[in-house]
Structures are given as structure tokens and as C-alpha cells.
């Protein structure tokens, strides 16, 4: 076990000092002893923390890069779109603790990996579904406080608005990782980011934070918005 220093920087998100000057973040493990993606486990005051790798998590990258508004916190009910194999959802699960995190993934094979890696996390609800068609899982998902989206589709901003109309509480938050190259490989990414921001605003969001997540992900930006729509 390593002696470390931890400091809470957001609710249930910790800055980690290992004495080497490197910037690290971690979450306190909801399933001690269980790794999800080969992450490093470290210990302080008899608590286990999972180092959050920003190279494998866009939310982790945004936090490392100076995210100012972090709406996911203890007690937050979350709808996660694009769960993949569970890397970031597992950290969201740690943060929310005893509150439900609905995790939607489209690909059956990846969903099987997700279930295998996260089956000890009782607050994670895996849903095999298409984020483009929120009505298909509306019988499972209730109203939520936050929607997080990491779906590499040309209409990714529209997908967020669709799901917000179905599930997001008024004045709830959304976080979306926009991948410019999934929308148009011929355009300047900055132009694409402005277009996607406009779609989100016209769809009903007030954008309260935005942060580029390079060098961890090329041509990506994270938007945080408050839902003011219907």
C-alpha cells in the first residue's frame, strides 16, 4: 500500500499527490479490490482510491484540464449515453455512490464487456439501447439530474436534446463530449464546436462551461449545460 495525499476537488472526486509532481485525480472505490480497466489502486487512511486515467476517459480529461462545473456528485441520478466498456461510468458510479446511474450502450459485444467489468456496482443499471431512440428505454429510465453523453455520431448534439426532453429535470445538467471528426472531417474543429454549441442552445440548454480536452483526445471539446427546455 502506498502512502498518498488526497484532497477533494469536487464531490467525491479527489486530487492525488504521490510526491512526484504529476497531476492525478481519483475516485473512492465503490467496489474495493475491483479494477475495471486496469487502473491503479491506491490507499489512504484505510480507503481505496482508483486513479482516473484521463487518456481513457473524456470526463477525466476535462477535470484534469480545468473543468469548472462538475454537476455529477454524491446523490446525483445520472443517465450515461455511450457507456462503452464501463471506464468512465465506473467512476461516475463511485461519485454518485448510492444513487442510480443508467448506462446506455448500443453494441451488444461491448455491453457484455461492460456487464462483466461493472457487475459488482449495484448502482449501475446497464441498458442495451440506441441513444437516438430514447423512447425505447423510457420504461426503464426515470427523471435524472444529469445526462452525460459520449456518443461519436454526426448528430450527437441532437441526441442530447432528444434525451433531455425525455428524462432531464428542469434546471438539470448535461455534459457532452463533442468529437469534431465524427461530425465532419473536412471542417475546422472550432467551426464544428460553434455549430454544435448553437444546436445545444437552440435545443434548450444554457452553456455554463466548455473545455478543450487535448492532448488527451484530439479535436474534442466538453460542454456543460443547464436544461431550460420543456
Curated annotation (Swiss-Prot):
Q: Which GO terms describe its molecular function?
A: histone H2AQ104 methyltransferase activity; RNA binding; rRNA methyltransferase activity
SUPFAM superfamilies from the entry?
S-adenosyl-L-methionine-dependent methyltransferases
Q: What is its EC number?
A: 2.1.1.-
| Top-level division of the source organism's lineage | Archaea
Q: What class of enzyme is it?
A: transferase
Question: Quick one: which residues bind S-adenosyl-L-methionine?
Answer: 87-88, 105-106, 130-131, 150-153
A GO BP term here is: tRNA processing
Asked if the keyword Plastid belongs to this entry, the reply reads no
Q: Does the keyword rRNA processing apply?
A: yes
Q: Which UniProt keywords apply?
A: Methyltransferase, RNA-binding, rRNA processing, Transferase, tRNA processing
Q: Which Pfam families match?
A: Fibrillarin
| Record PANTHER family | FIBRILLARIN, RRNA 2-O-METHYLTRANSFERASE FIBRILLARIN
Any idea what job this protein has?
Answer: Involved in pre-rRNA and tRNA processing. Utilizes the methyl donor S-adenosyl-L-methionine to catalyze the site-specific 2'-hydroxyl methylation of ribose moieties in rRNA and tRNA. Site specificity is provided by a guide RNA that base pairs with the substrate. Methylation occurs at a characteristic distance from the sequence involved in base pairing with the guide RNA.
Instruction: Name the family the entry cites.
Output: Belongs to the methyltransferase superfamily. Fibrillarin family.
Fill in the subunit field for this protein: Interacts with nop5. Component of box C/D small ribonucleoprotein (sRNP) particles that contain rpl7ae, FlpA and nop5, plus a guide RNA.
Q: What is this protein called?
A: Fibrillarin-like rRNA/tRNA 2'-O-methyltransferase
Taxonomic source organism = Methanococcus vannielii (strain ATCC 35089 / DSM 1224 / JCM 13029 / OCM 148 / SB)
Encoded by which gene? flpA
Amino acid at each position: 500500500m502506498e502512502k498518498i495525499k488526497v484532497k477533494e476537488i469536487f464531490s467525491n472526486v479527489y486530487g492525488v499527490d504521490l510526491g512526484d509532481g504529476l497531476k492525478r485525480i481519483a475516485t473512492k472505490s465503490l467496489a474495493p479490490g475491483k479494477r475495471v480497466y486496469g487502473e491503479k489502486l491506491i490507499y489512504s487512511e484505510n480507503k481505496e482510491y482508483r486513479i482516473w486515467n484521463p487518456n481513457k476517459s473524456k470526463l477525466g480529461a476535462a477535470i484534469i484540464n480545468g473543468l469548472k462545473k462538475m454537476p455529477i456528485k454524491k446523490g446525483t441520478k445520472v443517465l450515461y449515453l455511450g457507456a462503452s466498456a464501463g471506464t468512465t461510468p465506473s467512476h461516475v458510479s463511485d461519485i454518485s455512490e448510492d444513487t442510480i446511474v443508467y448506462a446506455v450502450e448500443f453494441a451488444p459485444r461491448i455491453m457484455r464487456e461492460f456487464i462483466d467489468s461493472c457487475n459488482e456496482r449495484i448502482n449501475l443499471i446497464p441498458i442495451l439501447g440506441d441513444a437516438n431512440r430514447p423512447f425505447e428505454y423510457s420504461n426503464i429510465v426515470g427523471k435524472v439530474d444529469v445526462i452525460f453523453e459520449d456518443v461519436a455520431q454526426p448528430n450527437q448534439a441532437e441526441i442530447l436534446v432528444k434525451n433531455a426532453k425525455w428524462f432531464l429535470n428542469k434546471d438539470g445538467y448535461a455534459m457532452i463530449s463533442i468529437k469534431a471528426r465524427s461530425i465532419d472531417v473536412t471542417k475546422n474543429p472550432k467551426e464544428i464546436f460553434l455549430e454544435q454549441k448553437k444546436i445545444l442552445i437552440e435545443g434548450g440548454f444554457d452553456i455554463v462551461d466548455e473545455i478543450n480536452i487535448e492532448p488527451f483526445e484530439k479535436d474534442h471539446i466538453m460542454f456543460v449545460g443547464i436544461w431550460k427546455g420543456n
